[in-house]
Amino acid sequence: MVQQAVIQRSANQRATNQPTEYIGRFAPSPSGDLHFGSLIAALGSYLQARAQGGKWLVRIEDIDPPREVPGAASRILAALEHYGLHWDGPVIYQSQRHEAYRATLNWLEQQGLSYYCTCTRSRIHQLGGFYDGYCRDRHLPASGAAIRLRQTQPVYAFYDKLLGELHAHPALAQEDFIIRRRDGLFAYNLAVVVDDAFQGVTEIVRGADLIEPTVRQIALYQQLQHPVPGYIHLPLALNNQGNKLSKQNHAPPLPNGDPRPILIDALKFLRQPLPEYWQDLDLYLLLRYAVKHWTLVSIPLQGAITPQKTQRHSQSKYGEL
């Protein structure tokens, strides 16, 4: 019988698996340089971790070579350091974690929790966008096929520490989603769950554009018998057209000048308390103040237009991606 899982805020539910140490993370993909939107996610996850007295890890999610920009990974790390966001421990690269992903795929296959699928995107689009399990019991060979998770524990809702209880479309929750692509590349949902579990991440702070895959990731956590982390999805920074700032939408990279004005814009975006005379503080003291006064209650629940001076500063000095 299919189990319905609803992840809610309950200290009692998580008491048995609750680690003693908070571990957060920032996990960018090297498909371009950091921009103001990615700074929001990095800063929010950093402040949440430091405010809990916890660790903040950085992972480079370089599992999709066709989308990677040469040199982007090193520039991302340099930008984080330039903005004072120093991480704990070594940086993990997903391109060096293939053995762990293969081991997880093998375990799922041995448990009867995965299968091969040759359905095309056009077929699924004709079905309304959700896969119908057509290949689930066809016992297809591996050649030319993707691998899907056999969904046994669909997650219909989860609790977000900022947004409250969020519900998924039933078809999305029940879908047997892809965990290894037809071209042999490991799927994002598989890699992120395997790595977050490996790194002991206790809470994931990221942008609201990743709300939808969360129910899939929680389902995979459960089928792999890993503790499920907490979630906070931050509002998205938007451009003048109301679209999410992203590398695909040519968001300008963060400037390399004084990082404090851009950090102030990011703190304003998150509606955090600001020091009265921040110009008199160095970068270390500014971030220390931000950690001390960090509060989730003030964060807006929806995205907002990026400050114009931030866009102009970045574009005029460094152009667009």
Swiss-Prot record:
Cofactor binding notes: Binds 1 zinc ion per subunit.
Gene Ontology terms, MF aspect: ATP binding; glutamate-tRNA ligase activity; zinc ion binding
Record EC number: 6.1.1.-
Motif ('KMSKS' region): 244-248
Task of the protein: Catalyzes the tRNA-independent activation of glutamate in presence of ATP and the subsequent transfer of glutamate onto a tRNA(Asp). Glutamate is transferred on the 2-amino-5-(4,5-dihydroxy-2-cyclopenten-1-yl) moiety of the queuosine in the wobble position of the QUC anticodon.
PANTHER family in the record: GLUTAMATE--TRNA LIGASE (PTHR43311), GLUTAMYL-Q TRNA(ASP) SYNTHETASE (PTHR43311:SF1)
Family affiliation: Belongs to the class-I aminoacyl-tRNA synthetase family. GluQ subfamily.
Residues that, per the record, bind L-glutamate: 25-29, 61, 188, 206
GO cellular component: cytosol
Name listed for the protein in its UniProt record: Glutamyl-Q tRNA(Asp) synthetase
Motif mapping: 'HIGH' region: 28-38
Keyword field: Aminoacyl-tRNA synthetase, ATP-binding, Ligase, Metal-binding, Nucleotide-binding, Zinc
One Pfam family per UniProt: tRNA-synt_1c
Biological processes per GO annotation: glutamyl-tRNA aminoacylation; tRNA modification
